[in-house]
Amino acid sequence: MRYRFDNSPSLRVLPYAHEKMIPHKNSIRPAVRTASIALLTLFLFATAARAQEPPNPKAPPSERHEFVISNFKTESGVTLPQAKIVYGTYGHLNAAKDNVILMPSHYMADYHGYEWLIGEKLALDPSKLFLVTTEMFGSGHSSSPSNTPEPFHGPRFPVTTIRDNVEAVHHLLVDELKVTHLRAVIGFSMGAEQAFQWSVSYPTFTDRIVATAGTAKCYPQGFIRLESQINAIALDPVFNNGDYTKQPTKGVEAFALIWTAWLYSQEWWRDELWREGAKPGTTFESTLNEYKTNFIPGGDANDIILQMRTWERHDVGTTPGFDGDLKRALHSIKVPVLYMPSETDLYFPVGDARYESGFIPNVTLKPIPSLWGHTAGAAPNPADAKFLNDAISQFLRENAN
């Protein structure tokens, strides 16, 4: 079976792949948003959309930065004159520059998405470590279809890969921060995809990686799910193949419903765990409507699609030198790996993690015993937060150089 990739170097949607592109005359810029795990459990915790600010009021202070790469060539062959990476930092870089941990963002997230790990009594103590949290292309803050001028605005923005994101952050670390080695790369979901890619593309750049609720490849079932979500947006007449003059709200809401169906486990819905932390009087219908209408507050449709295209193309086996051989790429990983799938994840099934673990030389497979599906990998409740922090703390201690 052949995947139906649109191999155009620009952002396209399959149902419209042969239609003539129309110049985009009106810029639709997304409202600035906080896309953290508080977003993933948006209704449960009644988290409102805010400008980029910490979802955790007890989170340590962070600093926001921007790094611009001139003439950044993507894997598609398209060169962006200026590629911007937005990132946050916690703590201070020591003189030896050897206290750095990288945490790349998950889907449509900003740089605050790992604050469940950051704190004096948590796995990552910013008084001792320098933590760098980056935002992927398409976040709406880093270079994205919504914020890039013509000729790369909207659907003309190039499709970017996980490797493109890794390469951009490698430039950031080496050229901007003068950091040539990391203590760890820690990632959730698409952040886990980036962590695996780091360990294959730059096998000695980091001492170890941690991957929660994410795999080294997007498998066929995941590809089909992503295509269904992309098509849900594209079938909104307002979308106009990405050249819209207002957001395709109906399409984005249809996308959000599909996404929500896969976000948690069947048991989570059956046991009505959505009631935990919910306001009095909350119903299933109101919960579902909240996800439908407010899943990615202010999100731009082209940005949403771009990151799904990035996700679809993820495969460490296609890294140059491995000729599409996933097993050989995984076997090349030289550093210890803490692999933490959620036992009930429908996005990244635990079976895929078990399969991949069989080819990684030094792996600790530690599934998260949770009913919270995919979100379990980002600490959506106290039990999962404790399990993750304890496991990651132990792994970092045991594998310290």
Per-region residue spans from a language model:
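Catalytic active-site module of serine/aspartate enzymes centered on a nucleophile-bearing elbow/loop
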Residues: 363-401
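Conserved hydrolase catalytic core segment
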Residues: 181-220
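Alpha/beta-hydrolase-fold enzymes
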Residues: 205-206, 211-294
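Catalytic-loop region of hydrolases
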Residues: 52-103, 111
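Short beta-strand/loop motif that positions the catalytic acidic residue
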Residues: 333, 339-341
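N-terminal cap/lid subdomain of alpha/beta-hydrolase-fold enzymes
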Residues: 88-151
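Conserved alpha/beta-hydrolase "acid-adjacent" motif
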Residues: 346-352
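Conserved acidic catalytic loop of the alpha/beta-hydrolase fold
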Residues: 163-183
